[in-house]
């Protein structure tokens, strides 16, 4: 039995199990800065965003993501951003702090190019003493493990044409592993590449449709795609649906109050074989928009 438990732990901490180092976001279009530094200061006003995602409610050790981002818009072509992200899954926890810089320039009357870089510090920790073992006094699992905050870089580019955009990014470039702790030498980070695209157009007076897609490319894993369609009424009320390929369906609602307070909520249900063991996912987003400087 003891060897079986050790085997399960080793499998759980293999690279295949934790290849998703970076968390999933359903409402990525409302906070694209978490995925690409090219969006730092891109909006017409500065903003602060808080997001909280609780995945697979009812499953012990299910992923939980908390994030805070800030975007500073300036009068020149520069933009700045900051972020704090914490992602938990079982005994694993990832924490990161990041600072972004982006440069925005007009290539023509309707085309804008943005390029951004991110400097971040990332910590990965493993809570071994919280695991339930047959032998509670086993010294191999008597303490927590942390990598400490390690430096990293990220990049992103964005091309906009009127109300349409396409963006490519790699938020974390450097790859680290846990093998110096002799827990599992095969554990290591995988590269995450993101492709985002979206547009918006008016379908009738006061109603705009906003389709978008986000594609994640991770080596040695299937490509993941989020497809979203949101209807915005009077630039205040949002209704949307989303689909993650072979994984989940979601619905969302959002409201903008006094042109500066935005609250969004997304509800997801699994549609894959996971539906037998997982329940729903909730995602909440709060955003404050600063007044535009005259």
Please place each PLM-identified region on the residue numbering.
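N-terminal hydrophobic targeting signals that begin at the initiator methionine
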Residues: 1-2, 21
